[in-house]
Amino acid sequence: MSGCESTPETDTPGALLYLQQTPPGQVPEVFAPGKISLANRGEFASVFSADGREFIFGVSGDDRAEVFSTRLVGDTWSEPRAVVSHERYSYMDAALSPNEDRMYFISNQPLDGEGEPKDPDLWFSTRTEGGWGPPQNAGPVLNSGRPEYYVSFTDEGTLYFTSSRAAEVGDEMNFDIHASRAVDGVFQRPARLGDAVNSEGYDGDVFVAPDESYLIFSSGRPGGFGGGDLYVSFRTEDGGWTEAKNMGSTINTDGQDYCPFVTRDGRYFFFSSNRDIYWVDASILDTYR
């Protein structure tokens, strides 16, 4: 579909990509069972690098969440390991910046790195020769006194994310999707997307197409199949967004469906549901236009 397809940025043989899993059709399947999706934990918020040689995902345990990664080394995928982790605080919802020199995520770590966990902020780590550097808070332009969640980037560097900063006091669960454009590498004051996308309830976990032609996000608005459903909205000619459309029972369940991501080659749509990561052929997105 437009905005989804691009030339794969890799010379890796196709059989080695996607952890050497058998590709899905238009019915979602659990991704890499026994390797990524395990029975004794929850997995969510996944992203592949542009060249398809690194897979980053979240793992939730009993008391905190961590960011894991596996890489294709030669013709073998490495054992997944935690790359952003803390014994007390959670790190999750990872996303890569357009040039992949930074990994953004959220954390409930206080600014001074001490004391009780706090409402989540946006953080990032810079890529180093050996992996990822120490977490750094993304600062007061992106972060507010309210929780922030889930980052996604356009090719031009606009950052989409979730925040309850616009909610009235006593209505802190009214999360909305915001966008912050980068000017000369500096993020500008975030703007809330309009009511075609946002509702009076929870709207978040947004994935934006690299060319900003569509959004996929999770919402708890009335009329869905479960506690949170995935919706899609397309860019209009005047720069607005079409009325968000529920992605239906093929994608959504009676549980929580969230954390969407479409691979850079435009082939696969990933999302999280019922404590596992799922994938499906991205051509399914054409059916919602």
Residue ranges and their predicted role:
Residues 8-289:
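Short, conserved micro-motifs composed of acidic
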